């Protein structure tokens, strides 16, 4: 995946199908966004972000109100405990594309990079008025050993998950963090300490 591919637009049927891309566009450039594009008759697009937050504390209502001022999301996102709530504007079949956030960088034994988040995609039938809870994963804190990147998810109002993408691992003191995976078996990151 190249940085340019994060901005690709896929068009779907004008009548019933819509496309939603929920991603951390910064998997390559560290600019953490969650983009939701609705390609229906009106061609609306919505870009959700982490409202300029990173680390373990999620955004507040004030953070997101400021972030979305002057956009199509202004006044349409409610934040509760760092999770954004949004109401589906039109019924249809949606493709949702989700990216987890990158892990934090590490600097203990050198300069190491956090692993990139996983990418997941799925198709869903959504109804107008349905409430979705959206969490945009936040980049892990960079330190001597970086923190893990946050996962991104979209769930229904009853907490039924629609789609989840795990975050990347934080960089250790002696190596880069591992990327998020899409398999159920997970991934182990381990290194060997070698004194300098």
Where are these regions (language model features)?
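Boundary/junction segments of secreted and surface-exposed precursor proteins
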Residues: 1-10, 40-67
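Extracellular and analogous surface-interaction loops
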Residues: 70, 75-78, 83-94, 122-130, ...
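Feature for long, exposed domains in two main contexts
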Residues: 1-42
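Extracellular beta-rich ligand/substrate-recognition surface
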Residues: 68-80, 107-117
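A mature extracytoplasmic/lumenal domain signature
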Residues: 5, 36, 98-102, 136-140, ...
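Surface-exposed coil/turn segments at beta-strand junctions on protein surfaces, enriched
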Residues: 11, 25, 89, 115, ...
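Secretome/extracellular-domain signature
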Residues: 114-196
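Short solvent-exposed strand-capping/beta-turn motif centered on an Asx-Ser/Thr pair
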Residues: 23-28, 89-91, 101
């Amino acid at each position: 995946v190249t940085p340019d591919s994060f901005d690709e637009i896929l068009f779907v049927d004008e009548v019933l199908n819509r496309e939603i891309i929920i991603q951390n566009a910064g998997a390559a450039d560290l600019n953490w966004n969650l983009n939701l594009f609705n390609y229906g008759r009106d061609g609306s697009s919505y870009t959700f972000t982490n409202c300029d937050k990173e680390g373990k504390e999620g955004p507040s209502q004030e953070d997101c109100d400021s972030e979305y001022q002057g956009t199509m999301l202004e006044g349409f996102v409610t934040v509760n405990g760092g999770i954004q709530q949004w109401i589906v504007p039109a019924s249809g079949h949606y493709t949702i594309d989700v990216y987890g956030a990158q892990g934090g960088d590490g600097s203990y034994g050198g300069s190491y990079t956090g692993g990139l988040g996983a990418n997941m995609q799925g198709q869903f039938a959504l109804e107008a008025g349905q409430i979705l809870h959206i969490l945009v994963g936040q980049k892990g804190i960079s330190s001597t050993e970086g923190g893990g990147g946050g996962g991104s998810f979209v769930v229904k109002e009853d907490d039924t998950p629609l789609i989840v993408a795990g975050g990347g691992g934080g960089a250790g003191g002696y190596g880069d963090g591992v990327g998020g995976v899409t398999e159920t078996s997970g991934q182990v990151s381990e290194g060997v300490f070698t004194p300098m």
